[in-house]
Amino acid sequence: MAQVITNSGHDDMIHDAGMDYYGRRLATCSSDKTIKIFELEGDSHRLIETLKGHEGAVWCVAWAHPKFGTILASSSYDGKVLIWREQSSAASTGSSWSRVFDFSLHTASVNMVSWAPHELGCVLACASSDGHVSVLEFRDNSWTHQIFHAHGMGVNSVSWAPAAAPGSVISATPSTGQIRRFVTGGSDNLVKIWDYNPETKTYATSHVLEGHTGWVRDVSWSPSILSRSYIASASQDKTVRIWTSDPSNPNEWTSHQLEFDAVVWRVSWSLSGNILAVSGGDNKVSLWKENLKGQWEKVKDIEE
């Protein structure tokens, strides 16, 4: 049963909402420059905190894995990425939130932030309209960063690959280790895959996926590691492309195109990685699944 929060407390449009790992907290962000934290219990919800610090619309919020603590990242039109942490205080006062890191090296809107799989550490990728991607990492009690050019006309989205290689779980041969890799979508209509080189400690493009004829608004890497790699990309050209790569030929990516009646804003995989949710400018959400023949079929429409 869906729970609807009708009175969000925000004074303007809400751009993103995200639940924590346990599904007990909900963070929302808005053009009113604030972030709201709700506590969820059964069918009820309670506003427990309003976080203020951004100087522009807040586009994105993302919870870190709980093994790093109660940490939330936010990104804004103001060009900043803020890292927030909840700290327990005296029993009588409960807990309090504080800003633990400000990252302000981007020169334009930061459109999306995405945490890496927790196996890779406390690592955050940030996509900006200045054409750059930054990667922040918390190690040894301090934050470090890398920033590099990614797309000529701006970066709209970023999504991490699973830490394990596809097929490694069911393979008879041992895995070669964890992979640090992500995908970006840009205003240059391109989807790019970035690989980390542990020797040079830098990221470089390993694949450029072409096919969209409009801005790529969102990308999402499937969390499934059972067989193949799947990346979904959503575009202003009214299509979603599902890019597939097989472990037997990891350098080849093929795509399947889904067509829609409106601009497509967001794509999101289920936790198991086998169902794709698509939302667009027509205020509809549809769910898609691959059949046994390798074709993608719509299994449900969700309309308010």
UniProtKB/Swiss-Prot annotation:
GO cellular component terms listed in the entry, alphabetical order:
COPII vesicle coat; endoplasmic reticulum membrane; nuclear pore outer ring
Q: What is the annotated localization of this protein?
A: Cytoplasmic vesicle, COPII-coated vesicle membrane; Endoplasmic reticulum membrane; Nucleus, Nuclear pore complex
Instruction: Extract the SMART domains matched here.
Output: WD40 (SM00320)
**Residues making up the signal peptide according to the UniProt record:** none
S-S bonds: none
Q: Where are the annotated WD repeats, by residue?
A: 9-48, 53-94, 105-146, 150-204, 211-253, 259-298
MF GO annotations: structural molecule activity
Pfam families in UniProt: WD40
Swiss-Prot/TrEMBL keywords: Cytoplasmic vesicle, Endoplasmic reticulum, ER-Golgi transport, Membrane, mRNA transport, Nuclear pore complex, Nucleus, Protein transport, Repeat, Translocation, Transport, WD repeat
Q: How does it sit in the membrane?
A: Peripheral membrane protein
GO biological process annotation, one example = positive regulation of TOR signaling
Where does the source fall among the domains of life? Answer: Eukaryota
Functional summary from the UniProt entry: Component of the coat protein complex II (COPII) which promotes the formation of transport vesicles from the endoplasmic reticulum (ER). The coat has two main functions, the physical deformation of the endoplasmic reticulum membrane into vesicles and the selection of cargo molecules. It also functions as a component of the nuclear pore complex (NPC). NPC components, collectively referred to as nucleoporins (NUPs), can play the role of both NPC structural components and of docking or interaction partners for transiently associated nuclear transport factors.
Tell me which family the UniProt entry assigns to this protein: Belongs to the WD repeat SEC13 family.
Q: How does it assemble?
A: The COPII coat is composed of at least 5 proteins: the SEC23/24 complex, the SEC13/31 complex, and the protein SAR1. Component of the nuclear pore complex (NPC). NPC constitutes the exclusive means of nucleocytoplasmic transport. NPCs allow the passive diffusion of ions and small molecules and the active, nuclear transport receptor-mediated bidirectional transport of macromolecules such as proteins, RNAs, ribonucleoparticles (RNPs), and ribosomal subunits across the nuclear envelope. Due to its 8-fold rotational symmetry, all subunits are present with 8 copies or multiples thereof.
Protein name, entry field? Protein transport protein SEC13
Originating organism: Coccidioides immitis (strain RS)
Q: What is the lineage of its organism?
A: Eukaryota, Fungi, Dikarya, Ascomycota, Pezizomycotina
